[in-house]
Regions:
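Extended active-site neighborhood of metal-dependent phosphoesterases/phosphodiesterases
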Residues: 56-146, 178-188, 206, 211-214, ...
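His/acidic metal-ligating clusters that form di-metal
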Residues: 30-43, 126-209
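Solvent-exposed loop/turn segments at secondary-structure junctions
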Residues: 50-52, 79-83, 119, 160, ...
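A short acidic, helix-capping loop that chelates divalent metal ions and anchors anionic groups
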Residues: 13-17, 84, 121-126, 162-166, ...
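Active-site glycine-centered loops adjacent to acidic/histidine catalytic or metal-binding residues
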Residues: 9, 48-49, 78, 115, ...
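N-terminal active-site segment of His-dependent metallophosphoesterases
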Residues: 1-61
């Protein structure tokens, strides 16, 4: 069994923002804690919103902060990220043949699949929502087919499920119906892991186990009713 560590929504920022002014320090402390207490981990997964504004300087700061980690890292993108700027600073991260930052890792009994839910400029959805276009869904279907005899854990920034927090549920994966229609064609999806919500939540949705994780940077207020 692999030991996977998840860091979610680190929101490194290069601008002055009182709520994020210690973002680099918080990530540095999280990495130090990881290396002191869980250094037997196999992979560190960042579930998106690596940067707060998607600026090159923010990704440079991230590159410097993770330079002390000598084990595999999987970076994923969220709605605060910029795909082009990220790839400029992390050129070793190759997008798939459609230009999206999607990948998979195959093990004896499990496969991990990492999805790119960052909207493209031509996706006609609200700016903070997630989206999986037909190309991304077809890529996912291909990977699920390859892993037919294994359990699959899907990682994605935007949750496809609802949490009861109305304001955040409005900003989830916009075409979650298409997503669930796609994965229900297979019987090997074991767990859905997401970021975006900035809280630890787990449950069952559409028959699938799911988990979200709190932000390394700042937590979301547990508020179920959205402001009108």
């Amino acid at each position: 069994m692999k030991k996977i560590i998840v860091f979610s929504d680190i929101h490194l920022n290069s601008a002055t923002d009182e709520t994020l002014e210690n973002s680099s320090q918080k990530l540095e402390e999280a990495i130090a804690h990881l290396q002191s207490n869980h250094n037997d981990f196999d992979t560190l997964v960042f579930t998106g919103d690596l940067a707060n504004s998607g600026k090159t300087d923010e990704y440079k700061a991230l590159r410097n902060l993770v330079s002390t980690i000598d084990k595999p890292i999987k970076f994923m993108l969220g709605n605060h990220d910029n795909r082009e700027n990220f790839l400029d600073i992390f050129p070793d991260y190759r997008p798939d043949h459609n230009g999206f930052l999607q990948s998979n890792e195959s093990y004896e009994y499990f496969d991990f699949i990492f999805l790119d839910t960052l909207k493209d400029p031509y996706d006609d959805i609200p700016i903070s929502c997630g989206y999986l276009c037909q190309k991304r869904l077809e890529w996912l279907a291909g990977k699920l087919k390859e892993a037919a005899n294994k359990k699959v854990i899907l990682f994605m920034h935007h949750p496809a499920f609802t949490t009861g927090m109305q304001a955040m549920d409005r900003l989830r994966l916009k075409n979650s119906h298409d997503f669930f229609s796609s994965i229900k064609s297979f019987d090997n999806v074991h767990h859905l892991i997401s970021g975006h919500i900035h809280r630890n939540i787990s449950g069952l949705y559409e028959g699938y186990n799911f988990s979200t994780f709190k932000s390394v940077n700042q937590q979301m207020v547990l508020k179920f009713k959205a402001d009108s």
